[in-house]
Each structure stands twice: as structure tokens, then as C-alpha cells.
Amino acid sequence: MNFYLDVVSLTKTIFSGFVEKIRVSGSEGELGIYPGHAQLLSILKPGMVYIFHKKDKKEECIYISGGILEVQPSVVSILADVAIHAIDLDRSRILKTKKNAEESIKSNNTKINKDAILLQISKEIAKLRVLEVMDKFK
């Protein structure tokens, strides 16, 4: 048994197809969604959408910057501002962005928006976690 999943960013559809299960980071913790799951609407934190395809036993990961999860009887939709396939993430760029943001926080510059920088750091950490999971698949 499976269900239809759509993962959509502001600019394009990242994934659309039948899956056996997914795992996402909701505002209240990790959510595992299986066929026949109860209807649900949840805010998603920056992190990973883990997708499992039973047919070919394929696992796939997508980074999302946060968003909304809607679960209906036969369709699950994830709407995210930013969604990137794990294979398209650039580890060196992520580490550089994270380092620059951390240095901005340490600089004690009163003109910076520390909340925005801390959010950026958390998003970069979430991307690194997605890459760590993908490394385990290899």
C-alpha cells in the first residue's frame, strides 16, 4: 500500500509520486506518515523529508527550509519556501555559510539581526544533517 506525495517549493515541484512512507520534522517533533494516516495539518521545521519507495526499495532525502504538511486520505502535500534534493546540496558552501554566520554573531555588531543569523545557522545545520543521512545510504 502507498500514497501520493507532492513536495513543492515556491519555484517548482521537487517531488511528485507514490511512496510507501515519509518522515518529516514537525513543530512538535518527528512525524512518520504511512498509508491510511489520519488527516493532519502541521508546521514543519527546517530539516529533512525522508522518502521511502517500496517498489524499488529506494530511499530519498529532500532538505526543506520549513513549511506546511497536509495529510489527506490518499495524498500528502508538503509546501516549503525552499526545497532541495540532498544530492544537490553543496557541503563546502553550507560549511562556509555556517562559518560566516557564526562569525557575524561573534562580532558583536549591533546592526546585525541576530535572530535572522541564528535562523540561518539552524538551516545550515539541518542541511548538514540531511547530508549525513545521505552518506549512510552510500
Curated annotation (Swiss-Prot):
It is a peripheral membrane protein. CDD domains: F1-ATPase_delta. GO terms for molecular function: ATP binding; proton-transporting ATP synthase activity, rotational mechanism. It is found in: Cell membrane. Keywords: ATP synthesis, Cell membrane, CF(1), Hydrogen ion transport, Ion transport, Membrane, Transport. F-type ATPases have 2 components, CF(1) - the catalytic core - and CF(0) - the membrane proton channel. CF(1) has five subunits: alpha(3), beta(3), gamma(1), delta(1), epsilon(1). CF(0) has three main subunits: a, b and c. This is ATP synthase epsilon chain. It comes from Buchnera aphidicola subsp. Acyrthosiphon pisum (strain APS). The gene is atpC.
